[in-house]
């Protein structure tokens, strides 16, 4: 049958359409033959041109508007069916590596393409899928759907296994992490327990160390005896290598120690021993055949941790000399002082006790030579006299342990008694008296003596702490040197009334001694203050802001005008005459702190007043010594400030201050001042006289 198309049109259609393509293909198949990347899959690619270029004898013309539909030969479907398996196999080969999801989509699209719908071109892969689906047939779709379902199950099983593996890995990680955290928590708890135990142990060790240190200090400050056998003979106590601690026992009379034949123990490193604080007797033990020189007390209380043996080290560490030889036995025997018997070393050059080597008879003879009247008589005699040595321990001086009671009962004056002689010593100064020596054992040789203000008194080194104010021997014996001291002071001052001056101060020993010094140095300071030459340069601060300093006395560098002003001031006032020495015998100065003023117009600086005047002067001196500041009072009794006084007298002008010497002015004001209500006050008129007299002085 002839075709209605022109040859050119038929050739073009053959060229663009495959030979096995059905005549009922959709129009989209003519335009979407080439694959588009991202839209068409490989299976949508049309067959090769070589396959399509073969002419088909049974090809039907394409559907045209002006041509009828050609009849389809019956063998055409068979040819298509025969050629489809090859094409399907090729498609399956190309689809082997595709995932299951793509296969499912292809199946769905292939199934949808069979529906009589005119919107196939709206699908994502419309043309290619429609051509492949129409050519493959129902068998191909069933085969493809069956393979897709198997691949989907296989892919689902892999994802499930992967999820299970992830869950298992996460679970194992959590378990490992929990185990690690638990392990760390256990270690932390263990370390905390160890730290707590270590802290407790450290606290215990600190306590032990502190206790050992206290015991060490106590042992260093206490005198103890270490006993050890001297020879190889065994004795009941020879194995005792411990310290012999003080043990209380009843008081027994002192007897000579036993012979050395029975003494098998020796005190090693024996330092001078002192009695306990409240002990009343320290005896040498004679209960056993061994004579141990140890410290024993009758105190019923246990020994204190820090006993009074600390006084042994008050002057430093006491060296322990080597033991003396047996040919020169040295002993320590008790000395009675205030009912106490102490083992002392005042008459012994050795501090180590060695057992006597002589027999009992020689030892008794030596004992009798030392104590001809027996020790008990000596103890009773001293107990009746109630006299002690010049130096006692700290425990026998409870007042001297504190400076709070320094001004009560002249305890400090008695403690450091460097004052003038007392009334009995002054009255009997012409007759030297020797105080009885304290009851301490003395030997002709190898003894240590300290004669401090006393004669024939052997002082105990261990008792060199403080003086005892209750005993007569505690005060220095001024009887031997009183006359020489008084004569020396009188010779320096040119005064022949030294004895009368001393008698005026019988009730005040310090004033008597200070009066002698004032005659020599003319001021209230120590002798070294006489050589302190203050600067004569003027400074308003010395008067405005500072009180008169006791360390700035008058010196020889003062002008004659200042001396005349002091002399005229004292003559006009009729008071303020003291007994001090100065540049001229014609003037008087009463400005010193320790000066003793007298109500007399006599310009000679000699003490010829009565005892009543001396007492009044002593009161005035005490008032002046207690008050260093002078208050200038006006007519209304109001205290004037130094700045106001300075301005009132016109001191702000420089020419008004050229004639003033601040030191002289302060001394003159102090001499004019009177004691009222415990304060030093100066009337404004007296102050004006002092200032204006200085102004008139240059014109004179």
UniProtKB/Swiss-Prot annotation:
Protein species of origin: Cryptococcus neoformans var. grubii serotype A (strain H99 / ATCC 208821 / CBS 10515 / FGSC 9487) (Filobasidiella neoformans var. grubii)
Localization terms from the record: Nucleus; Cytoplasm
Motif segment (Bipartite nuclear localization signal): 34-41, 67-74
Record GO terms (molecular function): DNA-binding transcription activator activity, RNA polymerase II-specific; transcription cis-regulatory region binding
Compositionally biased region (Basic and acidic residues): 150-185
Name used for this protein in its record: AP-1-like transcription factor yap1
Record family assignment: Belongs to the bZIP family. YAP subfamily.
Annotated stretches, region: Transcription activation 2: 452-577
